């Protein structure tokens, strides 16, 4: 593997030719399209990863983020291009701002898939992603009257990373057949060969059918199928649309897999020698019955043989402990949309019933619901969790009945992140600091970061203060960016306490907000923090998730109250950034001091935001949940702030079903005061009574994710973190320990384990 040797002069000539004019005369958008074409040419010139066996990573989401800079880093031309533009009076960061972010994902699931594609290519593995080409993604988030509003988020331009291919399939449904078209995005490895992300679309999609906000005719499948990621499923039409959409994804994937295997010489009886399929969460589960259907109906294979073949090809990654996220679909939905799959599913269920006398493991239950995860577990050869605690919980409680049947299938693969995007691209200043001390070997072997934990730095105040200076620079950059793009003013000298992740009650943004109410009331009473605090949220709520939208409303109301209170604003600021996405994350994460990872213990499978923050020198404030457990083990008690009940305590409380939030409310004046503030005159003056009262009642009568039992411990942990922050040398050492121990969370390590234990591509 060799760094790209293209000279600055050669780059200049090629870019000038692509733009049709001198660099200095180009607009930022013209430079972006020119660089995009240059990068695509270079990526196509590189060899693709080869091998008899190929991985197909099927996922409903690929939250890939902007691609220009990441690709230039991987191709080895980033610094040369940056310098070339500067010499011609242009800024690469200004060029980057003109790039639209692909709307192909929502949260951690999609971001993980994107990191994995980067690492698969970097490690030289023969593996492609397969998904859908959503035109509008999830949605673009707006704030109106202190509430979330949604509108389409178009991203596909005439010049884009998408390359239209000749691959097209006829996808059958009950009442019609749709014709697909495959588009490819090149996936560049770091100084290595390339793979592809295959995205299927339809040429009959009609973007104009979207009406007010993001509403559209959910029954007009030929026009709407690939418009949105996760269409609103609060009604029957939306839920059936999900079936149509998922089947479109997997039927295309299955046909592509079989075609490529046959081209390489497979008899299809030996398909497992040519293809391994990673099912990323339950959305692609229908690939199992669809492959069986295609093998039996189009390739004349006997049913038992087809089941055997497919069972040796498919592996399943479980990403959740939440029962609601383990998809279950009524049989009638399949009858209405894809009746050809039902006989296959019934055969699969019948085989399970004849083998096991346990209704909890059946595929089709007594209520005629099809359990998608059950298909994956019975008819795949591997089931993995995504953090050590998560996998243990799957084995011991959530999937215990299956673990007893197939202990050999279960394994753990702790999630990881690509350091190319989340350090090299997002934080070049920190990258240069690290390189100065330990060289650049960490760019390929992240475990080399451990070399940072050396007296040369830890005992050297000058170097520790350089680390603090880098953090201060990133905070100033974030403050400037938010001012320019969102009109938000924050104090760069304050403590940046950040919680960025999709809005869900189990992630407990509501607990963070209650603490901020508590802090606001303390300041009003005269108890002021030594250093001002800026609490930053970034989160989208699913359009039909009412309580999640109420939590956003509460935070935005609190933001307005504090912003207009001259007594409090110098000491406390609450900010909810608009339309949180990868681009914003790349600005927020390097600037963070305290990383909020406060999910209810036992509910977060892993998390990857915690890893990105850690890598950039933030200190984690969190529960012993998900990958926080492994971060805790790596950095030790002194370099993380752990609070709250253990997963064992939480699981036991759920089993006993004896939790009453009102008891905690009555017993703790701080909880009562904070919760009552939600429906106080101040909040009602800027908020909507219906939303605020509904959230108040939800907390007081349900609090399903146990905000109140952890609240006191949470407040104490935050105050300890704020106090420790005042000792700048101590804090710099905490930062350094976190950075030095982050190497374990490289997605290169994760992918190496997937290949060693599951895929066996090498």
Locations of regions flagged by a protein language model:
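A conserved ligand/cofactor-binding region detector
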Residues: 1-762
């Amino acid at each position: 593997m060799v760094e790209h040797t293209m000279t600055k002069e050669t780059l200049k000539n090629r870019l000038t030719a692509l733009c049709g004019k001198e660099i200095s005369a180009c607009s930022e958008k013209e430079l972006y399209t020119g660089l995009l074409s240059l990068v695509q040419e270079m990526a196509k010139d590189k060899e693709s990863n080869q091998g008899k066996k190929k991985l197909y990573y099927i996922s409903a989401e690929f939250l890939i983020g902007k691609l220009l800079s990441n690709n230039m880093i991987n191709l080895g031309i980033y610094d040369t291009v940056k310098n070339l533009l500067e010499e011609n009076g242009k800024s690469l960061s200004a060029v980057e701002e003109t790039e639209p972010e692909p709307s192909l994902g929502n949260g951690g699931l999609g971001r993980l898939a994107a990191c994995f594609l980067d690492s698969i290519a970097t490690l030289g593995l023969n593996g492609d992603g397969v998904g859908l080409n959503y035109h509008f993604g999830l949605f673009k988030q707006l704030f109106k009257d202190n509430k979330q509003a949604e509108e389409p988020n178009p991203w596909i331009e005439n010049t884009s990373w998408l390359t239209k291919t000749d691959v097209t399939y006829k996808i059958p449904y009950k009442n019609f057949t749709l014709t697909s078209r495959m588009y490819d995005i090149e996936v560049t490895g770091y100084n290595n060969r390339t793979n592809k992300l295959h995205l299927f679309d339809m040429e009959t999609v009609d973007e104009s059918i979207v009406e007010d906000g993001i509403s559209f005719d959910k029954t007009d499948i030929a026009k709407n199928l690939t418009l949105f990621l996760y269409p609103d499923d609060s009604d029957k039409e939306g839920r059936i649309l999900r079936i149509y959409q998922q089947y479109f994804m997997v039927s295309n994937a299955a046909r592509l897999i079989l075609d490529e295997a046959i081209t390489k010489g497979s008899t299809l009886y030996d398909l497992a020698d040519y293809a391994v399929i990673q099912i990323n969460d339950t959305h692609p589960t229908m690939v199992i019955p669809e492959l069986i259907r295609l093998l039996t109906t189009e390739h004349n294979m006997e049913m038992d043989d087809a089941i055997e073949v497919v069972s040796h090809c498919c592996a399943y990654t479980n990403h959740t402990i939440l029962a609601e996220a383990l998809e279950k679909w009524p049989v009638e939905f399949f009858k209405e949309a894809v009746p050809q799959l039902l006989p296959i599913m019934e055969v699969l269920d019948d085989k399970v019933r004849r083998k096991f006398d346990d209704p909890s493991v059946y595929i089709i239950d007594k209520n005629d619901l099809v359990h998608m995860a059950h298909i994956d577990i019975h008819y795949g050869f591997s089931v993995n969790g995504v953090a050590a605690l998560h996998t243990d919980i799957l084995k011991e409680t959530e999937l215990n009945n299956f673990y007893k049947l197939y202990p050999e299938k279960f394994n753990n693969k702790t999630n990881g992140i690509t350091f190319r995007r989340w350090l090299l691209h997002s934080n070049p200043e920190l990258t240069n600091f690290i390189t100065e001390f330990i060289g650049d070997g960490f760019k390929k072997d992240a475990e080399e970061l451990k070399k940072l934990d050396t007296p040369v730095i830890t005992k050297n105040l000058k170097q520790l203060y350089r680390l603090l200076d880098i953090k201060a620079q990133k905070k100033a950059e974030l403050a400037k960016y938010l001012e320019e793009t969102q009109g938000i003013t924050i104090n760069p000298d304050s403590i940046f306490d950040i919680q960025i992740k999709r809005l869900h009650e189990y992630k407990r943004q509501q607990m963070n907000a209650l603490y901020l109410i508590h802090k606001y009331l303390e300041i009003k009473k005269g108890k002021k923090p030594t250093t001002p605090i800026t609490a930053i949220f970034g989160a989208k709520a699913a359009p039909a998730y009412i309580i999640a939208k109420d939590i956003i409303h509460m935070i935005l109301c609190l933001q307005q109250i504090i912003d207009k209170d001259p007594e409090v604003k110098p000491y406390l600021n609450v900010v909810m950034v608009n339309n949180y996405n990868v681009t914003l994350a790349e600005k927020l994460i390097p600037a963070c001091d305290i990383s909020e990872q406060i999910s209810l213990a036992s509910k977060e499978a892993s998390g990857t935001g915690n890893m990105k923050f850690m890598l950039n020198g933030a200190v984690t404030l969190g529960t012993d949940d998900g990958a926080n457990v492994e971060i805790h083990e790596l950095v030790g008690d002194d370099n993380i702030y752990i609070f709250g009940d253990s997963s064992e305590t939480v699981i036991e409380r759920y089993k006993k079903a004896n939790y009453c939030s009102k008891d905690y409310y009555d017993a703790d004046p701080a909880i009562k005061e904070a919760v009552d503030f939600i429906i106080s005159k101040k909040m009602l003056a800027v908020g909507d009574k219906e939303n605020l009262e509904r959230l108040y009642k939800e907390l007081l009568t349900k609090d399903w994710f146990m905000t109140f039992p952890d609240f006191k411990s949470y407040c104490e942990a935050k105050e300890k973190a704020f106090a420790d922050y005042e000792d700048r040398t101590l804090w710099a050492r905490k930062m350094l320990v976190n950075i030095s121990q982050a190497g374990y969370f490289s997605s290169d390590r994760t992918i190496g384990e997937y290949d060693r234990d599951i895929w066996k591509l090498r």
